[in-house]
Amino acid sequence: ISHQSIANYCKSAAMCIKPFVDHYDYGTGNVFTADETYIKIRGVKAYIWFIMDAAKRSIIGYQVSDNRGVGPCILAMRMAFRNLKELPSHFKFIADGYSAYPLAAQQFFYELKDPFKFNITQVIGLTNDDAVSKEFRPYKQMIERLNRTYKASYRPTNGFDNIDGANYDLALWVAYYNFLRPHK
Protein backbone atom coordinates (compact mmCIF):
# COMPACT_ATOMS: atom_id res chain seq x y z
CA ILE A 1 0.00 0.00 0.00
CA SER A 2 1.46 3.33 -1.02
CA HIS A 3 1.37 6.55 0.97
CA GLN A 4 -1.00 7.94 -1.66
CA SER A 5 -3.46 5.10 -1.05
CA ILE A 6 -3.44 5.90 2.65
CA ALA A 7 -3.96 9.60 1.88
CA ASN A 8 -6.92 8.69 -0.35
CA TYR A 9 -8.44 6.51 2.40
CA CYS A 10 -8.03 9.33 4.91
CA LYS A 11 -9.68 11.78 2.52
CA SER A 12 -12.65 9.44 2.01
CA ALA A 13 -13.01 8.79 5.74
CA ALA A 14 -12.79 12.50 6.55
CA MET A 15 -15.49 13.34 4.02
CA CYS A 16 -17.81 10.81 5.70
CA ILE A 17 -16.99 11.72 9.29
CA LYS A 18 -16.73 15.53 9.07
CA PRO A 19 -20.50 16.23 8.79
CA PHE A 20 -21.15 14.07 11.85
CA VAL A 21 -18.40 15.72 13.90
CA ASP A 22 -19.40 19.23 12.81
CA HIS A 23 -23.14 18.86 13.50
CA TYR A 24 -23.07 16.68 16.61
CA ASP A 25 -24.77 18.30 19.61
CA TYR A 26 -22.11 18.11 22.31
CA GLY A 27 -24.39 19.50 25.03
CA THR A 28 -22.00 22.28 25.92
CA GLY A 29 -21.46 23.90 29.28
CA ASN A 30 -21.11 27.58 30.09
CA VAL A 31 -17.33 28.00 29.65
CA PHE A 32 -15.70 27.95 26.21
CA THR A 33 -12.00 28.42 25.67
CA ALA A 34 -10.30 29.25 22.38
CA ASP A 35 -6.86 29.50 20.84
CA GLU A 36 -5.12 29.32 17.51
CA THR A 37 -1.88 27.64 16.52
CA TYR A 38 0.12 27.49 13.34
CA ILE A 39 0.85 24.62 10.99
CA LYS A 40 2.77 24.48 7.72
CA ILE A 41 1.24 23.98 4.30
CA ARG A 42 3.94 23.67 1.64
CA GLY A 43 6.32 25.39 4.03
CA VAL A 44 4.05 28.41 4.55
CA LYS A 45 2.36 29.16 7.86
CA ALA A 46 -1.35 28.42 8.11
CA TYR A 47 -3.49 28.46 11.23
CA ILE A 48 -5.79 26.14 13.11
CA TRP A 49 -8.42 27.65 15.38
CA PHE A 50 -9.83 25.56 18.22
CA ILE A 51 -12.80 26.27 20.48
CA MET A 52 -13.31 23.84 23.32
CA ASP A 53 -16.03 23.26 25.89
CA ALA A 54 -14.13 23.42 29.16
CA ALA A 55 -16.44 21.08 31.11
CA LYS A 56 -16.62 18.21 28.63
CA ARG A 57 -13.28 18.96 26.95
CA SER A 58 -14.85 18.50 23.54
CA ILE A 59 -13.69 20.44 20.52
CA ILE A 60 -16.86 22.25 19.47
CA GLY A 61 -15.40 24.58 16.87
CA TYR A 62 -12.37 24.37 14.61
CA GLN A 63 -11.12 25.98 11.43
CA VAL A 64 -8.09 25.78 9.15
CA SER A 65 -7.13 29.09 7.58
CA ASP A 66 -4.36 30.68 5.60
CA ASN A 67 -4.49 33.82 7.76
CA ARG A 68 -4.85 34.86 11.37
CA GLY A 69 -7.64 37.38 10.77
CA VAL A 70 -11.03 37.73 12.38
CA GLY A 71 -12.85 35.83 9.57
CA PRO A 72 -11.60 32.34 10.47
CA CYS A 73 -12.20 33.12 14.15
CA ILE A 74 -15.85 33.94 13.36
CA LEU A 75 -16.21 30.70 11.38
CA ALA A 76 -14.85 28.64 14.29
CA MET A 77 -17.22 30.46 16.67
CA ARG A 78 -20.18 29.82 14.37
CA MET A 79 -19.39 26.13 14.51
CA ALA A 80 -19.12 26.26 18.31
CA PHE A 81 -22.44 28.11 18.69
CA ARG A 82 -24.26 26.12 16.00
CA ASN A 83 -26.49 24.14 18.39
CA LEU A 84 -27.24 27.01 20.78
CA LYS A 85 -30.42 29.10 20.65
CA GLU A 86 -29.00 31.44 23.28
CA LEU A 87 -25.93 31.49 25.47
CA PRO A 88 -26.01 29.58 28.77
CA SER A 89 -26.32 31.65 31.93
CA HIS A 90 -23.00 32.87 33.36
CA PHE A 91 -21.35 32.20 29.98
CA LYS A 92 -17.60 32.74 29.77
CA PHE A 93 -15.49 32.75 26.63
CA ILE A 94 -11.81 32.60 27.52
CA ALA A 95 -9.02 33.30 25.05
CA ASP A 96 -5.58 34.82 24.88
CA GLY A 97 -4.94 38.49 24.21
CA TYR A 98 -5.32 38.28 20.44
CA SER A 99 -7.67 40.97 19.07
CA ALA A 100 -9.62 38.65 16.73
CA TYR A 101 -11.65 37.19 19.60
CA PRO A 102 -13.28 40.44 20.84
CA LEU A 103 -13.91 41.49 17.22
CA ALA A 104 -15.63 38.16 16.52
CA ALA A 105 -17.74 38.58 19.68
CA GLN A 106 -18.81 42.01 18.41
CA GLN A 107 -19.85 40.42 15.12
CA PHE A 108 -22.05 37.90 16.93
CA PHE A 109 -23.77 40.66 18.88
CA TYR A 110 -24.23 42.65 15.66
CA GLU A 111 -25.78 39.67 13.85
CA LEU A 112 -27.74 37.96 16.64
CA LYS A 113 -28.30 40.74 19.21
CA ASP A 114 -28.83 40.08 22.93
CA PRO A 115 -29.07 36.26 22.99
CA PHE A 116 -25.41 36.18 21.90
CA LYS A 117 -23.96 39.20 23.67
CA PHE A 118 -20.84 38.15 25.53
CA ASN A 119 -17.43 39.46 26.47
CA ILE A 120 -14.13 37.73 25.92
CA THR A 121 -12.14 37.05 29.07
CA GLN A 122 -8.57 37.51 27.93
CA VAL A 123 -5.79 35.73 29.78
CA ILE A 124 -2.63 37.54 28.74
CA GLY A 125 0.95 36.40 29.13
CA LEU A 126 2.54 33.47 30.87
CA THR A 127 2.32 34.66 34.47
CA ASN A 128 -0.56 35.57 36.76
CA ASP A 129 0.06 39.31 36.95
CA ASP A 130 -3.60 40.22 37.56
CA ALA A 131 -6.72 38.74 39.15
CA VAL A 132 -8.27 37.76 35.79
CA SER A 133 -5.18 35.81 34.73
CA LYS A 134 -5.00 34.11 38.10
CA GLU A 135 -8.65 33.02 38.00
CA PHE A 136 -8.81 31.89 34.38
CA ARG A 137 -5.26 30.60 33.71
CA PRO A 138 -6.34 26.91 34.06
CA TYR A 139 -8.69 27.35 31.08
CA LYS A 140 -5.95 28.84 28.94
CA GLN A 141 -3.63 26.02 29.94
CA MET A 142 -6.34 23.54 28.92
CA ILE A 143 -6.53 24.89 25.36
CA GLU A 144 -2.73 25.18 25.14
CA ARG A 145 -2.50 21.48 26.08
CA LEU A 146 -4.97 20.75 23.29
CA ASN A 147 -2.71 22.62 20.85
CA ARG A 148 0.31 20.60 22.00
CA THR A 149 -1.66 17.35 21.69
CA TYR A 150 -2.65 18.23 18.12
CA LYS A 151 0.89 19.28 17.23
CA ALA A 152 2.27 15.99 18.58
CA SER A 153 0.16 14.14 16.00
CA TYR A 154 0.79 16.73 13.28
CA ARG A 155 4.59 16.92 13.59
CA PRO A 156 5.33 13.54 11.92
CA THR A 157 3.52 14.74 8.77
CA ASN A 158 6.18 17.44 8.18
CA GLY A 159 3.38 19.76 7.11
CA PHE A 160 0.69 19.41 4.51
CA ASP A 161 0.73 19.60 0.73
CA ASN A 162 -2.46 21.67 0.52
CA ILE A 163 -5.19 23.16 2.68
CA ASP A 164 -7.56 20.29 1.80
CA GLY A 165 -5.12 17.81 3.31
CA ALA A 166 -4.95 19.91 6.47
CA ASN A 167 -8.77 20.00 6.63
CA TYR A 168 -9.07 16.22 6.17
CA ASP A 169 -6.44 15.57 8.83
CA LEU A 170 -8.05 17.99 11.27
CA ALA A 171 -11.55 16.52 10.81
CA LEU A 172 -10.23 13.01 11.51
CA TRP A 173 -8.20 14.23 14.47
CA VAL A 174 -11.20 16.05 16.01
CA ALA A 175 -13.30 12.89 15.59
CA TYR A 176 -10.55 10.92 17.33
CA TYR A 177 -10.19 13.51 20.10
CA ASN A 178 -13.90 13.92 20.80
CA PHE A 179 -15.08 10.32 20.45
CA LEU A 180 -12.20 7.83 20.71
CA ARG A 181 -9.60 9.34 23.01
CA PRO A 182 -10.23 8.82 26.73
CA HIS A 183 -10.81 12.09 28.61
CA LYS A 184 -9.76 12.44 32.23
Describe each model-derived feature in a short phrase.
Residues 5-27:
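Short, basic alpha-helical nucleic acid-contact segments in DNA-binding proteins
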Residues 27-42, 50-52:
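Two-metal-ion RNase H-like nuclease active-site motif
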Residues 88-103, 123-126:
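Acidic/histidine-rich, metal-coordinating catalytic segments
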Residues 97, 109-138, 142:
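Conserved beta-strand -> loop -> alpha-helix junction used to position metal-binding or nucleic-acid-contacting
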